[in-house]
């Protein structure tokens, strides 16, 4: 495929509106994660890749992942066992957030941002980054991410991903482990940003993963959902999630945004406004 054509600069208000639209049908009228996946790839100009191309096999992998996540989510939801946070809606959130980061990157002429294979890879990673997540957090650091990578291997093989492509998927998913996020942002801060480099793409993946939890329009409901998910295994940690002090810790140490796209969208300004408001409330409590 040729490079993706020029794109208009997205606005963070439009991202918030897109996330609201995802929530309207959830969960009873949910159209399905495969439809969300197809819509974002159409929005990014990936609708008709050449058969046998890297884009074609990557999107085949992404669709297969989306279908399996949807099937698993429907089954677990019917049993009352779908995680309250790490569910199909979270995957859809991250696909939409990644779409806005990619569109902004393209509008900024970030290196690699208009390469169809890079864009397809980014979408596939978001579709699979929490593959068949069991819910909860009582695991060793990186265990859930490693499990997702392991469980994705047969799907990557079936789709014909090369060893190099599988390694990119692995590296980017492992970068979303909370203990790894700060390091990956520091790793690329002194270099020109190029999405063809795995660590730069990994930064975008970590940003898309927590963006909906950062935006004030969706943060509260997502924090409550995560607390519900944790409650059975770690009730004390679940209660602490809802405290303003914990929100402050999340904004200052976990919600990291350093890519050109995230900076242009104004994510750090969004964070700063929340931090100042919470600090003011705590001082006057």
Question: How does the language model describe each region?
Answer:
Residues 80-85, 121, 137-142, 159:
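Short, charged/polar micro-motifs that form catalytic or ligand-binding hotspots
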Residues 50-56:
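Low-complexity, highly charged intrinsically disordered N-terminal segments
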Residues 91, 98, 145-185, 245-250:
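Histidine- and acidic-residue-rich, metal-dependent catalytic cores
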Residues 2-47, 85-86, 97-118, 128, ...:
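Divalent metal-dependent phosphate-bond-processing catalytic cores, especially two-metal-ion Mg2+/Mn2+ enzymes
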Residues 62-73, 122-126, 169-177, 204-208:
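Short alpha-helical scaffolding segments that buttress acidic/His motifs in well-ordered protein cores
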Residues 64-96, 132-135:
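Active-site flanking loop/helix segments enriched in acidic
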Residues 94, 119-136, 148, 171-177:
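His-Asp-centered metal-binding catalytic motifs of divalent-metal-dependent phosphohydrolases/nucleases
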Residues 105-112, 138-139, 155-166:
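Inter-helical turn/loop segments and adjacent helix faces that build the functional surface
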